[in-house]
Structures are given as structure tokens and as C-alpha cells.
Amino acid sequence: MATSSSAFDDEFPMEEGMPELLDDEDVPSTLPSLLEQNMDTALKSNEFKLVKRKRRAGNAVDVVMEDISQPDDSTTDSPDADAEQKPTKRSKGSKGESRVVPVPKHRYTPLKDNWVNIFTPIVKNLGLQIRFNLKKRQVELRNPADREDTTDLQKATDFVRAFILGFEVNDAIALIRLDHLFLETFEIADVKHSLKGDHVSRAIGRIAGKDGRTKLVIENTTKTRIVVANTKIHILGAYQNLKLARNAVCSLILGSNPSKVYGNLRNMASRGAERL
């Protein structure tokens, strides 16, 4: 186990000499919505980059390329040959395709309280059909009968699944409006399988921190959202931010001091700001 811990430290180095406690001024009281935090990243990724034209050398000579291939009159003139050469367009899914998201018992009440906020963007913005099957205890989503594209259907499924896992509606809805967000789930045993009993509870306590401060700092610094559900960790965010948050959570599970993890995150966040 020592070798795995040292290998992890090499990948995610910890800084020495950090204070033992977090400063109160560094801990935000409330977090903005995940959509607002990642909107700037989405806009920057869509901006055009100005590419300067390279100067042409004075002794450069234009080279004219000639096509020496002889076209076959029998194939070019026939419309049937052109039809055979064109690839057929494949549909992404069948018409009226559906998705199912199971709902555990402890999420019945939150789902009922937030049902209006859930089905409104799915029905009005995406144009899908949704219902909660009480008998089978699952949320069912379906494409319209005249639509084959399943992109919106998959977005709506990820949105509902994120809410069922424990994320707030205002954070989970970012999966519908932004394309660069991902949802990752892993267990504490996947990081350190030797943890059992009270040691698992201590690892969960290190992730959350006193009054949830450690988790709040990680979320605010990495622009992600974290849900700790029993021994499972769910992280929602962009790919690079999700990687930073996952490394921070894994460091806490392996026993690193929260102040050191926070200091390392703060330095990485400052480096990212300098690059932008």
C-alpha cells in the first residue's frame, strides 16, 4: 500500500508548511450555481482565435499540381453510380426511443418537491416526454414519435440521474445547457480498499470537513459539485476541474491533511488563471 501512496503523491504532490486550519475568509458562505461557474469556460472555448498569416518567402515558387488520373466515363456519367458512392446516413436512434432512471426510496420526497423544476426544462426546452412510474418506481423519458436524434434524450437522462444521485436542480440542469460537463462516480474502496469500519467514517469526515467546509472549498476552487452518498462519491463538473477535485478527494481518503490539499488546490487554481 505504501507504493500506491507514494505513486499517488508523485502525481498529486502535497506542499509542506501549510497552516493546519483553513482561514475563515477563504471559505465561501454560499456557492453560485454550477451553470454560472462554467459559463465563462464555455464561452471562452467557443471564441475564435486570431491566427496570423505567415509571410511568404521571396524565393518561393508556386507549384501547380495536375490531375493525371483518367476518369471513367461509365461511372461518372451514370447517376446510379453516384448514389452508390454516397454513404447512407445513419440515424442515432429509433423514433420514440425511451430512457429509464430508477428512483430509490429516499429520493421520492425530493423528486416530488422539485418535479415542476425537473419536467419544465425537459418538456419545454428539449421537447421530450417524461413521467414518473409509481408502480415501477422509475422516471421514464421518451423521444417524440417524429424524432430520431437521441442527443437531447441523453442530456435529459443525465440531468434526472444527477438529481437522483443528490445534486441540486440548479446544478444538475447545467448538464442540459452545457456540453462539456461530466458526471463521475467512484467508491472509497476503489481508492483504498483496506479501509473498513470506523476508518471509512473518518475518511468521509475528512472529505466533508467541519460543517462541510472542506467539501465547500474543493467545490468552489475547482468549480465542481460533490455529493458524498454513503461510501460513494459523485463529482459533477468539467473534465479538467473534475480531475482536480477527484485528486483532492482521493488525497483526503488516503489521509492527507485538508489544509495541505486546500493549499495545493489554491496554487493549481492560480496557475490555471495565469494560463487563461
Swiss-Prot record:
SMART domains (UniProt xref): KH
Domain of life of the source: Eukaryota
Record flagged with keyword Transmembrane: no
Biased composition (Acidic residues): 8-27
GO cellular component annotations of the record: nucleolus; nucleus; small-subunit processome
Record CDD domains: KH-I_PNO1_rpt1 (cd22391), KH-I_PNO1_rpt2 (cd22392)
Xref: InterPro entries: KH-I_PNO1_first, KH_dom, KH_dom_type_1_sf, KH_PNO1_2nd
Subcellular locations according to the entry: Nucleus, Nucleolus
Biological process (GO), any one: ribosomal small subunit biogenesis
Domain KH, chain residue ranges per copy: 197-249
Region (Disordered): 1-30, 62-101
Keywords: Nucleus, RNA-binding
Entry's Gene Ontology molecular function annotations: RNA binding
Subunit structure: Part of the small subunit (SSU) processome, composed of more than 70 proteins and the RNA chaperone small nucleolar RNA (snoRNA) U3.
Chain's role: Part of the small subunit (SSU) processome, first precursor of the small eukaryotic ribosomal subunit. During the assembly of the SSU processome in the nucleolus, many ribosome biogenesis factors, an RNA chaperone and ribosomal proteins associate with the nascent pre-rRNA and work in concert to generate RNA folding, modifications, rearrangements and cleavage as well as targeted degradation of pre-ribosomal RNA by the RNA exosome. Positively regulates dimethylation of two adjacent adenosines in the loop of a conserved hairpin near the 3'-end of 18S rRNA.
Similarity remark: Belongs to the PNO1 family.
Protein name (database record): RNA-binding protein pno-1
